[in-house]
Structures are given as C-alpha cells and as structure tokens.
Amino acid sequence: MRLFYQRISLLISLCGFFSAAWASDVQPASSTGLWQRFTQNVAETWHHSPHQDLYVPAITWHNRFTYDDEHIRRYNERPWGAGYGISRYDEKGNWHAIYLIAFKDSFNKWEPFGGYAWEKQWRPFDRYQDIHFGAGFTAGVTARDNWKYIPVPALLPLASVGYKQLTFQATYIPGTYNNGNVFFAWLRYRF
C-alpha cells in the first residue's frame, strides 16, 4: 500500500509540474521573462504538438573515472524500457517535447522520468538537411527505488544527433565519487 501512495505522489508531482500547461492560454514567449517563457513553451507544447514520439533506452554508462571497479561490476548498464512523448518544432526550428519514460536504472529497478525538453537545432549541411544536431535541456521529475520512490526534480543537459525522424539523444547526470556521473542515452522516433 505504501508503494501505491508513493506512486500516486509521483503522479501528483508530475501534474503539478505541468499545471501551467493545462491551465494557461498560450501567449507570445518573446514578451515575458524566463519563467513565463518556460511555462508558455510548455503550454504551447501541450496544446499544439503535431508529433508523437517513441523513446527506447539505449545505454547507461557509469563514468569509469568516478567509480571503483566493485560498483561498476554491480551496476546495470543495459537499460530497457520505453517512453512516449509529444513534440513540436517552433518558428526558429527548435525542438520542444513533453514526455514520460520508464527504464531499468543502475540497480535494475524501474525508474520513471517525465518532463519537458527543449533543444536548439542545427542543420549544418546544406546538401543533407535531413541530418540534424541539437543541444538543450530537460526539466522533469524522477523517482527511484533506492530513494523510496519519492519524487525528485531534475534539470539536465541534452544533446542529440539525428537523421530524419530518428534521433539519438543523451544526457549526463552529474554526481560525486561512486554516485551519479552517468551518461544515459536513448533512441527517439518521431511519428
């Protein structure tokens, strides 16, 4: 029963995170401050996203310079799971998404992560416009078994390389010795 309440708590936290998107009218992002721009982009993404995305975790890599061999041997570096999101490209060609993904973490326990993501997009090859690169951030909420599934906010960097609708996207979770310092990547397919 306790696990049930912890999962309900996570759901409530996610709903609170996106309350601005569900409740606000979309206004021009250029006329406001950073927080207003953020909430308006979340709202615009929630209300006007023409794309649906499938997320498939690809790799978890613990930085060998920050972990001892005992921890490396114990940890799972082959996550499996899936996720779903909605996304859009703005007038500048930048990518926005709202998503929820669940995967097996370092301890081989389920970890959900839901949030908003933004990436500045580049198409550096005139001849090959289908190839794109991105850099940005994700802001969301996660919960882990070793933290008793208490919802924890997270703000993480994002980077990607893609071809047409398929994108290899990744983040790096900073940390201390034997904690954090994890490269996590997934494939994202846009429908």
From Swiss-Prot:
<keyword id="KW-0472">Membrane</keyword>
<dbReference type="GO" id="GO:0009245">
    <property type="term" value="P:lipid A biosynthetic process"/>
</dbReference>
<feature type="active site">
    <location>
        <position position="106"/>
    </location>
</feature>
<comment type="function">
    <text>Transfers a fatty acid residue from the sn-1 position of a phospholipid to the N-linked hydroxyfatty acid chain on the proximal unit of lipid A or its precursors.</text>
</comment>
<keyword id="KW-0732">Signal</keyword>
<feature type="site" description="Role in the phospholipid gating">
    <location>
        <position position="177"/>
    </location>
</feature>
<protein>
    <recommendedName>
        <fullName>Lipid A acyltransferase PagP</fullName>
        <ecNumber>2.3.1.251</ecNumber>
    </recommendedName>
</protein>
<feature type="active site">
    <location>
        <position position="62"/>
    </location>
</feature>
<dbReference type="InterPro" id="IPR011250">
    <property type="entry name" value="OMP/PagP_b-brl"/>
</dbReference>
<dbReference type="InterPro" id="IPR009746">
    <property type="entry name" value="LipidA_acyl_PagP"/>
</dbReference>
<feature type="active site">
    <location>
        <position position="105"/>
    </location>
</feature>
<keyword id="KW-0012">Acyltransferase</keyword>
<feature type="signal peptide">
    <location>
        <begin position="1"/>
        <end position="23"/>
    </location>
</feature>
<keyword id="KW-0808">Transferase</keyword>
<comment type="subunit">
    <text>Homodimer.</text>
</comment>
<dbReference type="Pfam" id="PF07017">
    <property type="entry name" value="PagP"/>
</dbReference>
<comment type="similarity">
    <text>Belongs to the lipid A palmitoyltransferase family.</text>
</comment>
<keyword id="KW-0998">Cell outer membrane</keyword>
<dbReference type="GO" id="GO:0016746">
    <property type="term" value="F:acyltransferase activity"/>
</dbReference>
<dbReference type="GO" id="GO:0009279">
    <property type="term" value="C:cell outer membrane"/>
</dbReference>
